[in-house]
Amino acid sequence: MTLSTEMSDASGLAEETDIDVVGEGEDEEDEEEEDDDEGGGGGPRLAVPAQRRRRRRSYAGEDELEDLEEEEDDDDILLAPPAGGSPAPPGPAPAAGAGAGGGGGGGGAGGGGSAGSGAKNPLVKPPYSYIALITMAILQSPKKRLTLSEICEFISGRFPYYREKFPAWQNSIRHNLSLNDCFVKIPREPGNPGKGNYWTLDPESADMFDNGSFLRRRKRFKRQPLLPPNAAAAESLLLRGAGAAGGAGDPAAAAALFPPAPPPPPHAYGYGPYGCGYGLQLPPYAPPSALFAAAAAAAAAAAFHPHSPPPPPPPHGAAAELARTAFGYRPHPLGAALPGPLPASAAKAGGPGASALARSPFSIESIIGGSLGPAAAAAAAAQAAAAAQASPSPSPVAAPPAPGSSGGGCAAQAAVGPAAALTRSLVAAAAAAASSVSSSAALGTLHQGTALSSVENFTARISNC
């Protein structure tokens, strides 16, 4: 009895161990099931519970899922410890541990995948503004000037964030170049082919960043307009009256109005004004000559005091001298041979100088003729009358002829007819000019009393004929 019971228990354990290994002999079990169906069972078989009996495999997806779920439920039931507290068989335990370890490994793999996905996106935007990026690009170039495409190329090569998002920020770089005064556009040279202008930094924007750090900008740079230096001194000089100083052509007054520009102060920052030899090389400020000092003073005085009288103009000689010295003018060697202006005394006296000037073919009156107006015509007529009076002519006051010799007197007067006609025409022209123009406009050379007396004498002589 005991031997049979022990053998039965051993056979039961063997059955359990064979059943616990699921999926190990699926092909063998399928073949056994087919043999059972065909032959109706040949030899003795181990008793298998009804729940463990495998059904014919169907090729539908739902049937396969149901079979797998039933097998997993059966495995859980077999692996569960009995109610009496007997220890579980040692076989399935390693499989369960391996499954748990595999699950842990899968979790670790999942965690590693999440960490890898987090480290896969390191694109962080740099903490620099577009102005700082452009400044970096320009400063690293050898000539301290770059085009828009070269600036974008530098930024893309230096920062991966902008390399990945390249087309989006190119317009921002363009707008910052155009709208900020710290960047100056330089056109291309005629012999330098290419597209786009160059951009450089304004020399006065060196202190734009704090201590050379591009993380923070100290202030917004604004380009100052070109104003005359020392404006306060110029205004005070204008208020005191700069007309006399400008009229005298004093170089000291001109230097006070327009002093030379002072040299730039030494830079106190450590990184220097962006290095040396970059940007626009502006020419030094040159003060204007003293010739323009009076004009500038008059314009500024009129702007400050619109109701005040203008300052007196500079003398003719001083202005001419200033013009010659300011513009490097030197008199031509033939200039001494040209006739100079007629002195006022000679014009009033009506001497030979005036007549020679009137008869000169190079004078303005001889070239233009009578188009200078009535004053010039009156002056020319007066000069001609003075020349006629200086020449020998019969006395205007003649003794009255005897009654018996009236015919002889008329014949004598008829002999001098052409000369008298010329004199009468000249005197008539002088009288007409004197009636239309005042004696001051005729330069004081024509006296109305003399003209009237001459007309009366000629009228009396004509009536005697």
Swiss-Prot record:
Biased composition (Acidic residues): 15-39, 61-77
Pfam annotation, one family: Forkhead
SS bond partners: none
Molecular-function GO terms, alphabetical: DNA binding; DNA binding, bending; DNA-binding transcription activator activity, RNA polymerase II-specific; DNA-binding transcription factor activity; DNA-binding transcription factor activity, RNA polymerase II-specific; RNA polymerase II cis-regulatory region sequence-specific DNA binding; sequence-specific DNA binding
GO biological process, one term: luteinizing hormone secretion
Gly residues: compositionally biased ranges: 98-116
Gene Ontology cellular-component terms listed: chromatin; nucleus
Origin: domain of life: Eukaryota
Effect of A356G: Decreased activation of transcription from PGF and C3 promoters
Role according to the record: Transcription factor involved in regulation of gene expression in a variety of processes, including formation of positional identity in the developing retina, regionalization of the optic chiasm, morphogenesis of the kidney, and neuralization of ectodermal cells. Involved in transcriptional activation of PGF and C3 genes.
Protein name as it appears in the record: Forkhead box protein D1
Protein species of origin: Homo sapiens
